């Protein structure tokens, strides 16, 4: 399934994988998965985390390695994000719930994920998604950005 991914997508997923793989050992454990999900405002139970891992854990060793992660991401992309998932994701970024993602809100979420971005990088991300040029990202722009991936 991962064969259908572009090199750019694989590089992005590699970056995402290393955000999850806190200790850099090449595997994502339930603990690491939980940490990242909680930093995104989710609160998965231990059982839910186990389920997520065993769903893609091809060699049944209890962790996710990069090839397994790629398969998971390829599968998720095929299911393309449901309206509901996109609304949830937007809420994670839109901290003050005003219907817009500001540069500060984007920086806050990325920092929680352990991603240290320069102001320039954050501004660049906003610029890429900001179609109407008001300096922030509304829900429409967010959906367009997520579906363009």
Swiss-Prot record:
Q: Which organism is it from?
A: Solanum lycopersicum (Tomato)
Give each disulfide bond as a residue pair. none
Listed name of the protein: Calmodulin
Supply the InterPro entries for this chain. CALM/Myosin/TropC-like (IPR050230), EF-hand-dom_pair (IPR011992), EF_Hand_1_Ca_BS (IPR018247), EF_hand_dom (IPR002048)
Q: Which residues bind Ca(2+) 2?
A: 57, 59, 61, 63, 68
| Keyword Ligase tagged | no
Q: Cite a single Pfam family from the UniProt record.
A: EF-hand_7
Question: Into which family does the record put it?
Answer: Belongs to the calmodulin family.
Quote the SUPFAM superfamilies the UniProt record gives.
EF-hand
Q: What is the lineage of its organism?
A: Eukaryota, Viridiplantae, Streptophyta, Embryophyta, Tracheophyta
Which Gene3D superfamilies does this entry report, sorted A to Z?
EF-hand (1.10.238.10)
Q: Which GO terms describe its cellular component?
A: cytoplasm
Spell out the note in the miscellaneous section.
Answer: This protein has four functional calcium-binding sites.
Indicate the segments forming the EF-hand domain, all copies: 8-43, 44-79, 81-116, 117-149
